[in-house]
A protein has these predicted regions:
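A short, exposed loop/beta-hairpin motif centered on an aromatic-Gly-Thr core
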Residues: 42-49
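Residue-level recognition of the N-termini of beta-strands and the immediately preceding loop/turn
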Residues: 36, 66-68
């Protein structure tokens, strides 16, 4: 697996995309249920049922995907188990 270092500006862009993903998760559950999504600049730029498929699509269309938030949008209900 390839490891990439992000400079400050690109890391901030990545953080903004992750923040947007978290803030909009409920909307994404309705619009992109059970899909992997790529977020850039406050919008979904691609989605796919498989992570491999999404990454292949992104690499075809973009030269640098390091700032994208790439996450899975699950509709499964999370339960907290306290022991």
């Amino acid at each position: 697996m390839e490891t990439l270092a992000l400079d400050g500006e690109r890391f901030r862009a990545y953080q903004e995309n992750i923040t947007w993903f978290r803030a909009n998760y409920e909307k994404l559950q309705k619009s992109h249920p059970n899909l992997f999504v790529a977020i850039s600049k406050g919008r979904v730029i691609a989605s796919n049922r498989s992570l491999e498929g999404l990454l292949a699509q992104l690499r075809k269309e973009h030269t640098d995907i390091t700032t994208f938030a790439i996450e899975y949008v699950s509709t499964a209900r999370a339960e907290l188990l306290m022991l």
